[in-house]
Amino acid sequence: MNAQRRRKVRAATTLGLAVSLVAGVLTAQPASAATAVTLSVDASAARHAISPDIYGMNGAEAAFAAEIGLPVARWGGNASTRYNFKNHTYNTGSDWYFENIVAGPDNTVESFVTTNRNRGTRQVVTVPMSGWVAKDSPGAHPFACGFPATRFPAQDGFDQWDANCGNGKLNGTNLTGAVPTDTSIPVDASFAGEMVSHLVSQFGPAARGGVPIYELDNEPVLWNATHRDVHPDAVSYDELGGKSTATAAAIKTADPSAAVLGPSGWGYCEWVASGLDGCAPGADAAAHGGLNFSQWYLKNMKDFSNAHGGKRFLNYFDQHYYPQIGGGTDPDANALRLRSTRSLWDPTYVEESWIGPGGVNAPPLQFIRTMKAWVAQYYPGTKVAITEYNWGALNDINGALTEADVLGIFGREGLDLATMWGEPQPAQPGAYAFRMYRNYDGAGSRFGDVSVSAVSSDQGQLAVYGAQRLCDNALTVMVVNKTGSDQASPLSVARFNGNGTAQRFTYSPADLNTIVHGDDLAVHRGRIDATYPANSITLLVLPARRR
């Protein structure tokens, strides 16, 4: 991650965002205090597959990854921008004094692929695209670095363990005049092709169990900040477009069966504008048909495909999503965190951040739906991914509730791939949100893999998500009580086994160290009456009718 990612408070202008409703999802008026929230599930409506890849992470403790059957892991972040597979060296960029670090044996790209292949986890591997990778460097202090004291004796800060390596700032202003070859060597798209060929030689092509997905660098519009010692200039439409098509072509030449993912922008500004334009479409956009950055990126990839006989060079349209909220857990912060998930889908929700009325007054983001609308217009058939996201507070029940809500939204909205950045520790509440979907009973049982219609009369109090499981046809219903009070709510189930019992699994503040298998609930004529504890996640499992 990058220091600039903090909360990205920049000026911007409004963006025309698509408004589209998904069948089976209603935006309801809040229920009154005296009215119980009602829930309904229709097992035959709004059916579509849920991609298992939405439950991914950028990394995870080994036992936890095995416990939840981690489906996909990403090798990326700022260090990947200048990673040199030939000498296993990367540069930390502005994250840590622009230092070249030789990766240990457990931190190489080969080790990452091996570890994840061995546990059945698909891999997303980032390839460099900025034009520079780390040169041969010492394995211990003193390191090669982008702003050495020998060139820049006056800086605001130096590495306490390496006094020659500075932060590249003086009086809070970025220094200029760094010499790229102090740390790096110039490369072009052929380097990415060599890297993919190397991994194919080690692990085979994607079609035979090799690396399945390659990412076109990381947050490129921030290169002139994160990696400003080698790339001080702002990224333009033409630079990113040219480097992306050339690198994608090199990847596809080295492994035609591999998928390509990009552009992996850091957030709102990079979704809509180039580095030259800043945080709103400007002169650079005007010179490219008036399209925002994401729209033009997709169109450029489609045009490149058309010029090469229709061959696909972009398989996943990827952006990063960090909600522009604080990281606190006070009541106001917790309430905002839970509301903010609506920016992923809700056409009535306007951002309560610098993006919203107090800032650029953007219309509702409905981010996943907007990404899908851009794809449908400019490069149909491209999948949609979010390879970095984090709502925070994973050490708190509020973070667990939010993550459970987010995972439910990902499945309902048809996202194809997601990998959390800054994954929870196994004992933290945030980890239990993943367990509720991926291992709720400790025996590997999972939430369903075919999304079905699930509607709440007040999604802000009780969020509900439904899915049918293909292996046994059971209906699974996830209910997230976002309130501080127990909620008694009737659930109606249509076009499924209307009588019998439902298993109940709950994670709540009553015991933050386990998922509790409670008493079964009666299902009578398609109705379940249940009370959902305050600040809880509850999974109901309804078995299919016996034939």
At which residue positions do the language-model features occur?
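Secretory targeting and sorting signals
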Residues: 2-33
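Substrate-binding cleft of secreted/luminal carbohydrate-active enzymes
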Residues: 55, 303-306, 315-324, 389, ...
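Glycoside hydrolase catalytic-domain groove-lining segments
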Residues: 245-253, 315, 321-390
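Active-site clefts of carbohydrate-active enzymes
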Residues: 221-228, 265-281, 346-357, 371-400
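N-terminal catalytic cores of secreted or lumenal carbohydrate-active enzymes
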Residues: 34-334
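Glycan-recognition and catalytic regions of carbohydrate-active enzymes
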Residues: 396, 407-474, 498, 510
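Carbohydrate-binding surface patches
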Residues: 458-498, 538-541
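C-terminal beta-strand-rich structural cap/linker in extracellular carbohydrate-active enzymes
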Residues: 521-547
